[in-house]
Amino acid sequence: MMMNKIKNIYKVGIVVFLIMCFASCVKDTTNTTYLGPDLVEFANPNYIAPINPTAKTVATTTTPKNDSMYIQLVGPQRSTGTSVTFVVDAASTAVAGTDYSLSTPSPVEIAPNTSGIKIRVVLNKVTAQKKLIINLTGGDKVTPSANFKTFTFTLNP
């Protein structure tokens, strides 16, 4: 009698196991591939605190600070380079040559078979808070993302 109960429990266990195996093999029909137009956008890959991908606050010192912002391609990688242009916004209060200098001039080129490029900037000591605002203006068959086309450095003394 006890042996029959053990056999029945064993059989039920095997059936449950087989059902779980077949149920877990259901094909995922969710498509997560981006199908929209090719865009470029600023991305600030800050893995410690990824709060704001398009802004950064920097405390300046007497020694110039090297920093960067990242432009990424949204869409498939291309077999040829992708030219991207950017400009310093007229609303910037930081002065070129005094408060900052762009080590990477516009336009930049996203290399073939890659998804982005860094724009390097040198930030100098400021005596009052200043803002450096960079806008993406487009490029080689790409348009700037509406939400991530502006990057702002806030320079603090």
Residue locations for each model-derived region?
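Residue-level detector of intrinsically disordered terminal segments
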Residues: 1-2, 19
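Short boundary segments that mark the start of a structured unit
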Residues: 26-157
